[in-house]
Amino acid sequence: MSVLSKLMRAGEGKILRKLHRIADQVNSIEEDFADLSDAELRALTDEYKQRYADGESLDDLLPEAFATVREAAKRVLGQRHYDVQIMGGAALHMGYVAEMKTGEGKTLVGTLPAYLNALSGEGVHIVTVNDYLAERDSELMGRVHKFLGLNVGCILANQTPAQRREMYACDITYGTNNEFGFDYLRDNMAWSKDELVQRGHNFAIVDEVDSILVDEARTPLIISGPADQATKWYGDFAKLVTRLKKGEAGNTLKGIEETGDYEVDEKKRTVAIHESGVAKVEDWLGIDNLYESVNTPLVGYLNNAIKAKELFKKDKDYVVLDGEVMIVDEHTGRILAGRRYNEGMHQAIEAKEGVDIKDENQTLATITLQNFFRLYKRHDHDGKEQPGLSGMTGTAMTEAAEFHQIYKLGVVPIPTNRPMVRKDQSDLIYRTEVAKFEAVVDDIEEKHRKGQPILVGTTSVEKSEYLSQQLSKRGVQHEVLNAKQHDREATIVAQAGRKGSVTVATNMAGRGTDIKLGGNPEDLAEAELRQRGLDPEEHIEEWAAALPAALERAEQAVKAEFEEVKELGGLYVLGTERHESRRIDNQLRGRSGRQGDPGESRFYLSLGDDLMRLFKAQMVERVMSMANVPDDVPIENKMVTRAIASAQSQVETQNFETRKNVLKYDEVLNRQREVIYGERRRVLEGEDLQEQIQHFTNDTIDAYVQAETAEGFPEDWDLDRLWGAFKQLYPVKVTVEELEEAAGDRAGLTADYIAESIKDDVREQYEAREKQLGSEIMRELERRVVLSVLDRKWREHLYEMDYLQEGIGLRAMAQKDPLVEYQREGFDMFQAMMDGIKEESVGYLFNLEVQVEQQVEEVPVEDAAPSLDKGAQDAVPAQAGARPEIRAKGLDAPQRRDLHFSAPTVDGEGGVVEGEFTDGEPAQAQSDGLTRAERRKQAKGGRRRKK
């Protein structure tokens, strides 16, 4: 354990003692709540809300609130929170990451802090890793909250903005990290206050926090729209590179000549083209110099084509389905619906596979998950800020330092409810991969013969299919669970603990379903009640009454098989390869031995595994030559075991550095994002922009005058050029001659005098413009102009910042720190953008030809869509009265181009949603009591599809 980790764990005992005290407090009052009727229990929610409003803090209410939820869960779900679950709930409320082993009931733990924090009325977000879990948990755990009188919402990929707004208005909202993040970004692209769906970021509980905040933190959430790009080159280069040969790098010092046309570094995932390759490409394309500035884009196409050929392997990194290239997640082995590689990489792979090549996209809005989750802040009664983020996972201690450094989150390991008795066997290492899989199949066959349930973990779809073929040859019945079959997933996992079952799965990280020995009684009981026509949503009371008996019957059925499986040694987890991260290995192991059940785990490795090949190549070669053992005999070697551990920590450190680096660079953009989004929000909130436009005008005029009069005497100033600039800005009425006359002569002019005179003139022209258009239209024009210019400038700025970041690494060669340079230049670009926004806003305001359309009646949205609950109305911004709708050439219309969403996905399901937004009305715009804007929004929402 590193020194840093030890320091991290220094205060652990103190926190655990505090959590024990809280659990004891809750236990001491448990009986008082058991005697209450359902109605009395429900009435407590309003009482707590009132006490909070009267000045009590949430910490004061904690013991009673937890006892209330414990009693409600007992009545509605037939599950009572264990003491360790109460401790976990308290840790979450205090803003920690609670490390709870698999099968300790993390989902149930979330109900405690969610209920407590919902009492403040600010909203609680519970973040899961995929849509299936969000829906399942909001339905299952939502029963407890609904029983206590709170309303629960769930954000899913295909909802319309009106539905989303209603879900966010609920006390507790479930959803995936991507949906929460995209809604934040879309809110900051909204054209009016009525389009906003979120109501702030108060408190978030993140399930599988390590997957979301660590594994996926390197990939930002991006909303992009189409950019102009020539697609013909991708196809041409895909054909070209098939004629180039891979070779090795040369070394002039050792006199080794380079071979082939290009070299590939698998470890760094880079390629480099050799002289011979360049010559061939120039020859084939008929150009003189590939590296001339005019040919720069071609170098990018060439590099991407080589990478697509060498580094991106079909059925490992991506699959081709229905003529589309789909990325496979390296962590979970699932298909990432709709996610595309950027920088033209995806197009290069499409060209390689010969499928349709889609357009490249330009970033319109972006945020990393790290910065999104740092938005969550709670405020106590005195307005003091407290962290609003917490999370739970089975494996967090290995990343404790990272949680602390980046999110300021402490990690608390919560003890298990029953002691752990799983046997973790030592690794078996084989010389070749073929021999390893032979041994794996032998082991599976032997264990299967006696009936022990087996779960096999593989690292890629390819390997799980290879193993499946081997098992079929031996006649072993088994289930395969990988990226290609999402739908049956939960059912397969729930039954993976039955006698004689064999389940082969790509990374099981974050699958969220418990493997219970002998089968899952909850699933059986639920199926029985649904067959009888009951629904937990509609028949809350009847469901609660019928559940205990159904559960008992299901448990009896499962119990006999459970005892049998227990005798056989419980679930056997077999890993066929070590993952890059120790944490994912531990997650796989953790599927077995839950709640004190027996279990066993073992990893089979070979010296040809990716991890060993990439990080410990020389050492592997040494062992191979030393160990003169036949292929089918495992190598027992301390050195190899140590090498594996060191390779894993090497990869982890490397990934942590990458994430820290991403964050440092995004930090620069984050501060800029806060300024721009804050500005946008003020415009949307309907703040009167008159004063702001005044500031914009004054600043622009000062800048113009300053630029022209900074040097020389008044006689030297080029006032004609200055007036030319003013004329482009607004219709100038005052002339140079008038000013000279007033000042006596040219020499009497001062910069201040010119600036003041022009400002007075602008004010007059502004008032004249307002009189001509009418003040209401003028206000709407200001709003639209500022939003339109702000958005366009921010889009251009994001593009520039991307471009800057790509090349900034080269500054290191000039002995400069790339990050410092990026901060400095990024700040200069931001200043230039802000000046541009001011200047263009003023210019547009005076020079646009405005047409006023008919007045649009703004119908309060709650009338348009049936509301879940009266409480939902608070969050719906209904704008009274009518607002003029205006059109002007050069002003963005409040519709979106085709938008594309790209985000990390922990579990494939969250994927990426691709938007196709229509330009005008939906085809049937029947009069349905909605405004045009809302009908358009509904059309947008309805057309979103998952790919």
UniProtKB/Swiss-Prot annotation:
ATP binds at Q85, G103, E104, G105, K106, T107, D514. SMART domains: SecA_DEAD, SecA_PP_bind. GO terms for biological process: intracellular protein transmembrane transport; protein import; protein targeting; protein transport by the Sec complex. The keyword Membrane applies. InterPro entries: Helicase_ATP-bd, Helicase_C-like, P-loop_NTPase, SecA, SecA_CS, SecA_DEAD, SecA_motor_DEAD, SecA_preprotein_X-link_dom. Residues 934-947 have a biased composition (Basic residues). PROSITE patterns: SECA, SECA_MOTOR_DEAD. Residues 864-947 are annotated as: Disordered. It is a peripheral membrane protein. Part of the Sec protein translocase complex. Interacts with the SecYEG preprotein conducting channel. Has a central role in coupling the hydrolysis of ATP to the transfer of proteins into and across the cell membrane, serving as an ATP-driven molecular motor driving the stepwise translocation of polypeptide chains across the membrane. Monomer and homodimer. Part of the essential Sec protein translocation apparatus which comprises SecA, SecYEG and auxiliary proteins SecDF. Other proteins may also be involved. This is Protein translocase subunit SecA. It comes from Streptomyces lividans.
